[in-house]
């Protein structure tokens, strides 16, 4: 009898020890990755990043643990890509077109009136993805997924009838391309870091703002601007990426899992963006912001100016960029 009890105790001890060893092994060999993001934690992009991290943790059985660091958590918006590129932090999220100092190809999805719907934006992404991945790889960064913001419009304090109504008004360019486009419209650029944008808007330092309907909550736009013009000008993508050095520390199994999760999150994100756009437009109306469709004349004036921007981009980008543009135009 005593021998049987001793065997049962020993068996139970061995099982407990085995569980503890497994837990210890997982904790010791877990790869913990920090991921700073530039957006408020309640934005749909931030929520996608959080779901991505949670799913990766679950499907790798805690071997890969991603910690999403919300806005103002240590890295400024403009510092994130460089920090990942130089392996100072493992992962990050950034507006692709704001990285145009890294490559002119990153301006592609912000070319005004090139891709003005989700379908067009996705087609543009498909034809350019391989080139984007190659440019990022050269910079020691791997693309995981890309999701667009809703289409860009224009916030104004006063009603706009023609482009003459925009001349001399201040705006914040968030890339070289938006700077060029804004200037072509007669706007005056004002440099405002992203982390200072909400304050600049509240102090009425900007007369107009390019942004989607979903930008209002993040920066308090509805408290300052009376109109939002639904230009459908472009759909800029937010990208999530990892340093190549950190990527190569993952096993092939975990790499496959991360890419699988990223693909699902990307697909979910494009749908979430559409929903965020619809919800944000309703919220703008609730906040007494007038949603305006530009007149036929005004839209035509915007498009004529955009052609000059696209032509200049094509002149500067070189053969690889023109090839991507031509493939898209043939779709």
Task: Show which residues each predicted segment covers.
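N-terminal secretory/targeting leader peptides
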Residues: 31-120, 128-132, 136-331
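Bacterial N-terminal signal peptides
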Residues: 15-26
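A composition/secondary-structure signal for short, hydrophobic, low-basic-content segments
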Residues: 4, 22-23, 30
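Bacterial N-terminal signal peptides that target proteins for export
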Residues: 3-17
């Amino acid at each position: 009898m005593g021998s049987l009890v001793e065997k049962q105790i020993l068996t139970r001890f061995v099982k407990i020890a085995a569980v503890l060893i497994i837990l210890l092994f997982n904790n010791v060999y877990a790869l913990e990755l920090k991921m700073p993001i530039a957006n408020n934690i309640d934005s749909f992009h931030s929520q996608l990043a959080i779901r991505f991290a949670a799913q990766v943790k679950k499907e790798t059985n805690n071997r890969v643990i991603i910690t999403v660091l919300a806005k103002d958590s240590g890295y400024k918006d403009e510092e994130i890509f460089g920090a990942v590129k130089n392996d100072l932090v493992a992962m990050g999220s950034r507006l692709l077109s704001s990285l145009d100092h890294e490559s002119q190809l990153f301006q592609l999805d912000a070319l005004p009136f090139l891709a003005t719907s989700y379908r067009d934006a996705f087609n543009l992404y498909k034809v350019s993805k391989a080139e984007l991945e190659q440019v990022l790889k050269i910079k020691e960064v791997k693309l995981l997924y890309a999701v667009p913001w809703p289409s860009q419009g224009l916030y104004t304090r006063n009603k706009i009838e023609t482009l003459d109504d925009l001349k001399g008004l201040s705006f914040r360019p968030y890339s070289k391309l938006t700077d060029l486009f804004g200037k072509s419209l007669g706007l005056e650029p004002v440099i405002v870091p992203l982390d200072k944008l909400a304050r600049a808007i509240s102090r009425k330092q900007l007369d107009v703002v390019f942004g989607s309907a979903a930008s209002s909550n993040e920066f308090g736009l509805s408290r300052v601007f009376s109109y939002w013009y639904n230009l459908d000008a472009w759909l800029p993508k937010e990208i999530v990426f990892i340093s190549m050095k950190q990527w190569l520390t993952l096993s092939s199994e975990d790499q496959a899992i991360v890419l699988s999760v990223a693909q699902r999150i990307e697909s979910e994100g494009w749908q979430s963006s559409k929903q965020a756009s619809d919800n944000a437009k309703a919220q703008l109306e609730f906040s007494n912001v007038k949603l305006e469709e530009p007149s036929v004349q005004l839209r035509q004036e915007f498009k004529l100016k955009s052609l000059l921007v696209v032509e200049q981009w094509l002149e500067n980008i070189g053969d690889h960029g023109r090839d991507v543009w031509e493939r898209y135009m043939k779709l």
